[in-house]
């Protein structure tokens, strides 16, 4: 008998029973459907295991189960999560924070599909202008063309011409023969009417214009039928174009069924959406193929020091003088300028330098004595730049390409000026704006423009554009609601942070208007200023109010308090976590004593330091920074302090630190190839000796990379195993315990632990290796054990467990202890780096740097290190960062988290808005000093935070 009460419960809640994925301790729990639920807890407490690896994984598995047996055969069996039962599950959509799109052609506009609607708008409602004359393009029907001919040429003798060739080289012998066979007697070649004769041909090396003379007639009512027939024929032969030549004045007019310039006769094809796509051959700029930039050879890198002579190595790709052909060629070239190889480049004429770089027109004479020949030898010289370009080509070796890369620079395409589109696409306008100009506007500015553009459209355009504009405005509004008003549609997806990518996907989902869906999000508040948090929370509530369930893995205080339901995982991380320590409303949670609730209700807090550090009295000054939206700012970075760079999203923080300061320092200390954005000067480099950029990029690109290999501790672990009696008896070397080389690894999977099944048009599927069952090594290697554990068992240990296991091996302990100190005790030593979040990758890098010796003169740069961190984890992280500063180092942190900001010694606040409204230095000083400022949004939040202490 059916229990209808059970069915009612299923409707109301998502019921999870017996979840044991990763560290989950056989938990049972319920999450109300149709609610905004926050899952919180310490890093490694089991939040992601519950939300993504249990609920989402089961939802995805059930979806695949609906496929036909034939389709499932290709997909392989998706492993069922280790859970007894999940009921009440809707279709699940996961929106994670990883920036997976590395395609340079992907932009905010293409990801959100807003650019697709803009393309449709310009194709249907755009007004075309000639790129030659700037005149508005016109197009006519055949009836209109006949009326115009009657009006303009009544009673006059005219030639009706059909254009066949426009400014192209060739002898066109075959074309003239084809025209003659069709019965036409005359052609107009380069402005002159000529009779077609047998074997007629032109100069093949010159550009030509060719029109066939369809008819020669007088425009009268009597000849109306003949004129109509001739116009139709001309249109057919000329692919929609025809020209009228006045026999008396020899003036020419152009007519077309297609869009045409009335002055020059230039014609465009009927616009379609693909004509405005930089990913389509019909729309892309022919020079840069739609990328907006080209790779050029940087002359300043080829000749970096002009005070040197070529003999001394002024030309970097050649080095110092060698007795070889290229130096003989340059020597011969310089003779005509009365110079030698020992003349400093600065004293050479500019023409000589250009010929050295780009080649000489005439052949050069190499003296017979140099080549031990009986007579002089004449050679062509193509130049250094040509040689480097040859090394860049696809068929050159990887070594040659890498060598050539050091002399290259990426520059804006000189043809499209970065617009990515061809001239034709850029000359369609709506209210004086082309599609590129719209895509460079900040989203807030574009939204305002689109709200008022209909007032400036003609009635026909307004009718056509109405629905498209409505769709674009709706989607832009969603982007505004999730705090992305400072982005532009042409912003490359590659340059977006994880938080920005996630919020774009969130806005796209809200725009899709789906209902009865379960959304699972991973820390959507990453990278958001406190000001924008409320807008994000409202967007999530809007998603809920559509009739969906929203689960958010989050640490943000505002998000927790705004939720309908909170699940707190804990009590600690790793093996000590995996339990639900609280589940209920935020109001109920504030009354409990879990670690999270104590931080929420104020019983526990991250304390403000008793006094701010004074620093070492030295400073780094960056002057005139003007990259992206920076407005020529001068910024002081006092050394020996914890510096926090703050400001709303898009205010210029990352541009200032990651794109300007960090590349300057990397170039100075490590000869980095990354070019800093424009700036005037940097002062104070003599006070520091190295820079360490601890970013959130993955540790490695493949699952073979893991915390053990990245930190270098895996080499020590392998050496430990090599020293064991069993390994010595068998004669094993360190390579035996590596999963990257043959010998000790499982050869069935190549040491991966899994096999990759390529799905062609679907994402690859990973299946555990049936031979080693994911252990990566062969049976013989796994027989060598230390304290009863094989090398595979060690890689499967959490950092916390490994610290206990290796407590008597100082060389290993010192490296893994630091991973524990930065709050990563819950991750596994051999966990593939591709499964680590951006914040986790950043902390592995931080731990690696901490385990190295420092001189007390290092600058550490961190971008949002609190990503993925609980209040307690932030406290641990700040202890680590403070240790670095206490040793005399300087730590520069880009951060929105008030717990970090209030602990800084010095704050640099950027703003006041994002995008074009930002890029200014608003205030700087201690948190107490900045809190008194009346500029921007940050001071108000700092003031509230300090008052609550």
PLM segments and residue spans:
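Conserved phosphate-binding elements of NTP-dependent enzyme cores
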Residues: 1-949
């Amino acid at each position: 008998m059916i229990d209808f009460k059970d069915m009612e419960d299923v409707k109301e809640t998502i019921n999870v029973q017996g979840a044991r994925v990763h560290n989950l301790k056989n938990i049972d729990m319920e999450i109300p459907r149709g609610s905004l639920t926050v899952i919180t807890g310490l890093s490694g407490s089991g939040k992601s295991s519950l939300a993504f690896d249990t609920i989402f994984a089961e939802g995805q598995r059930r979806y695949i189960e609906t496929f036909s047996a034939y389709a499932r055969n290709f997909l392989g069996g998706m492993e069922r999560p280790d859970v007894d039962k999940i009921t009440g599950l809707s279709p699940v959509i996961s929106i994670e924070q990883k920036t997976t799109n590395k395609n340079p052609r992907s932009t905010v506009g293409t990801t959100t599909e807003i650019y697709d609607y803009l393309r449709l708008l310009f194709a249907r409602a755009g007004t075309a202008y000639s790129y030659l004359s700037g005149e508005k393009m016109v197009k006519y029907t055949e009836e209109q063309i006949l009326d115009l001919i009657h009006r303009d040429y009544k009673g006059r003798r005219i030639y009706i011409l059909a254009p066949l060739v426009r400014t192209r080289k060739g002898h066109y012998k075959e074309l003239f023969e084809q025209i003659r066979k069709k019965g036409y007697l005359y052609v107009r070649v380069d402005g002159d009417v000529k009779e077609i004769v047998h074997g007629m041909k032109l100069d093949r090396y010159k550009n030509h214009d060719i029109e066939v003379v369809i008819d020669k007639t007088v425009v009268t009512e009597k000849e109306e039928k003949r004129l109509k027939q001739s116009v139709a024929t001309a249109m057919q032969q000329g692919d929609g174009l025809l020209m009228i030549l006045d026999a008396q004045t020899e003036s020419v007019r152009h007519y077309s069924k297609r869009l045409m310039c009335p002055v020059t006769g230039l014609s465009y094809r009927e616009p379609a959406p693909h004509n405005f796509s930089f990913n389509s051959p019909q729309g892309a700029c022919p020079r840069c193929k739609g990328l907006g930039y080209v790779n050029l050879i940087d002359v300043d890198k080829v000749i970096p020091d002009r005070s040197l002579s070529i003999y001394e190595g002024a030309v970097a790709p050649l080095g110092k003088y060698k007795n070889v052909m290229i130096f003989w060629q340059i020597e011969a070239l310089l003779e005509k300028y009365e110079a030698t190889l020992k003349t400093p480049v600065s004293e050479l004429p500019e023409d000589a330098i250009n010929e050295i770089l780009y080649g000489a027109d005439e052949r050069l004479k190499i003296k017979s004595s140099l080549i031990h020949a009986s007579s002089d030898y004449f050679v062509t010289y193509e130049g250094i730049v040509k040689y480097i370009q040859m090394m860049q080509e696809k068929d050159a070796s990887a070594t040659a390409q890498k060598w050539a890369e050091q002399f290259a620079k990426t520059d804006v395409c000189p043809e499209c000026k970065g617009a990515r589109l061809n001239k034709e696409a850029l000359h369609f306008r709506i209210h004086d704006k082309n599609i590129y100009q719209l895509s460079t506007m900040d989203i807030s500015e574009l939204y305002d423009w689109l709200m008022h553009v209909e007032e400036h459209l003609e009635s026909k355009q307004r009718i056509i554009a109405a629905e498209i504009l409505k769709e674009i405005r709706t989607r832009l509004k969603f982007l505004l609601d999730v705090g992305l008003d400072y982005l532009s549609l042409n912003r490359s997806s590659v340059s977006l942070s994880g938080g920005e990518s996630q919020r774009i996907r969130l806005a796209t989902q809200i725009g899709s208007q789906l209902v009865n869906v379960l959304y699972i999000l991973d820390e959507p508040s990453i990278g958001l200023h406190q000001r924008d948090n409320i807008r994000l929370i409202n967007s999530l509530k809007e998603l809920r109010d559509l009739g969906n369930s929203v689960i958010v893995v989050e640490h943000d205080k505002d998000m927790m308090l705004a939720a309908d339901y909170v699940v707190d995982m804990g009590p600690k991380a790793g093996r000590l976590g995996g339990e639900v320590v609280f589940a209920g409303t935020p109001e109920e949670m504030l009354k409990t004593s879990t670690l999270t609730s104590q931080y929420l209700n104020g019983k526990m807090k991250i304390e403000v330091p008793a006094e701010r550090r004074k620093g070492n009295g030295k400073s780094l000054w960056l002057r005139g920074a003007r990259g992206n939206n920076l407005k020529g700012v001068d910024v002081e970075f006092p050394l020996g302090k914890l510096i926090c760079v703050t400001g709303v999203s898009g205010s210029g923080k990352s541009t200032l630190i990651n794109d300007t300061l960090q590349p300057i320092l990397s170039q100075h200390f490590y000869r980095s190839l990354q070019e800093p954005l424009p700036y005037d000067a940097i002062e104070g480099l003599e006070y520091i000796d190295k820079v360490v950029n601890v970013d959130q990029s993955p540790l490695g690109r493949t699952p073979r990379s893991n915390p053990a290999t990245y930190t270098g501790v895996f080499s020590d672990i392998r050496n430990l195993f090599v020293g064991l009696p069993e390994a010595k008896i068998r004669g094993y070397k360190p390579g035996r315990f590596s999963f990257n080389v043959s010998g000790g690894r499982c050869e069935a999977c190549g040491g991966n632990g899994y096999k990759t099944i390529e799905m062609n048009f679907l994402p690859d599927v990973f299946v555990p290796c049936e031979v080693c069952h994911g252990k990566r090594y062969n049976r013989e290697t796994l027989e060598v054990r230390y304290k009863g554990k094989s090398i595979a068992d060690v890689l499967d240990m959490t950092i916390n467990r490994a610290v206990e296991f290796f407590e008597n091996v100082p060389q290993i302990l010192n490296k893994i202890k630091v991973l524990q100190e930065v709050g990563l005790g819950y991750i596994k030593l051999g966990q593939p780096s591709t499964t680590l979040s951006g914040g986790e990758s950043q902390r592995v890098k931080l731990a690696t740097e901490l385990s190295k010796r420092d001189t007390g003169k290092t600058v550490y740069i961190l971008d949002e290190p609190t990503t993925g961190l609980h209040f307690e984890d932030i406290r641990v992280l700040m202890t680590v960062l403070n240790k670095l500063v206490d040793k005399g180092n300087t730590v520069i942190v880009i951060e929105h988290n008030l717990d970090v900001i209030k602990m800084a010694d010095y704050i640099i606040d950027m703003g006041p808005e994002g995008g074009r409204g930002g890029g200014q230095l608003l205030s700087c000083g201690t948190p107490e000093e900045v809190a008194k400022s009346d500029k921007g949004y940050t001071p108000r939040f700092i003031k509230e935070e300090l008052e609550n202490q």
